[in-house]
């Protein structure tokens, strides 16, 4: 027990020499590679942080561009929708105008046809009246007339009737 508590100066000397030799050798051969590896790792971490920040900045820039594009697309869509609505309204108005014009033409055509049929009916009635008047006059007179005379007489009677109407 005494031997453990008593220092051996030779052992202390060689322990110190070994320690200093170990420190020297580690400093000469191992310390630089360890420090180099630590610095390389620190540089890599620093570079990764820079790259991550650049990527984050780029992502924010792209997001901002996409937001602008989305806004522009939304505006364009609204403009297109407004144009389509305006075009649809124009087409609707044009169709209504065409339908009105068509109905007015149909009404005018129908009125013209009615007027033509009325005039034709009046002519036929007047001709029949004139024929009946000629026949009645011929019966009263008891005279047989030729067709030329009948036609001239009918024309005169028709003219008289037309002038009176």
UniProtKB/Swiss-Prot annotation:
Question: Which domain of life does the UniProt lineage start with?
Answer: Bacteria
Cell membrane as a keyword of this entry, yes or no, is: yes
The UniProt keyword set, sorted, is: ATP synthesis, Cell membrane, CF(0), Hydrogen ion transport, Ion transport, Membrane, Transmembrane, Transmembrane helix, Transport
Recorded hits in Pfam families, A to Z, give:
ATP-synt_B
Q: Which GO molecular function entries does the Swiss-Prot or TrEMBL record give?
A: proton-transporting ATP synthase activity, rotational mechanism; proton-transporting ATPase activity, rotational mechanism
SUBUNIT field = F-type ATPases have 2 components, F(1) - the catalytic core - and F(0) - the membrane proton channel. F(1) has five subunits: alpha(3), beta(3), gamma(1), delta(1), epsilon(1). F(0) has three main subunits: a(1), b(2) and c(10-14). The alpha and beta chains form an alternating ring which encloses part of the gamma chain. F(1) is attached to F(0) by a central stalk formed by the gamma and epsilon chains, while a peripheral stalk is formed by the delta and b chains.
Q: Give the protein's recorded name.
A: ATP synthase subunit b
Organism whose genome encodes this protein: Elusimicrobium minutum (strain Pei191)
């Amino acid at each position: 027990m005494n031997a453990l508590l008593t220092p051996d100066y030779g052992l202390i000397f060689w322990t110190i020499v070994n320690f200093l030799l170990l420190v020297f050798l580690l400093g000469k051969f191992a310390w630089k590679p360890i420090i180099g590896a630590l610095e390389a790792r620190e540089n890599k971490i620093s570079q990764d942080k820079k790259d991550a920040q650049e990527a984050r900045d780029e992502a924010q820039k792209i997001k901002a561009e996409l937001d602008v594009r989305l806004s522009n697309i939304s505006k364009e869509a609204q403009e297109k929708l407004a144009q389509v609505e305006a075009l649809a309204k124009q087409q609707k108005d044009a169709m209504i105008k065409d339908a009105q014009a068509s109905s007015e033409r149909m009404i005018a055509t129908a009125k013209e046809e009615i007027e033509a049929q009325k005039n034709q009916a009046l002519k036929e009635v007047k001709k029949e009246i004139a024929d009946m008047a000629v026949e009645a006059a011929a019966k009263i007179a008891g005279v047989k007339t030729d067709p030329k005379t009948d036609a001239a007489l009918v024309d005169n009677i028709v003219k008289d009737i037309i002038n009176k109407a």
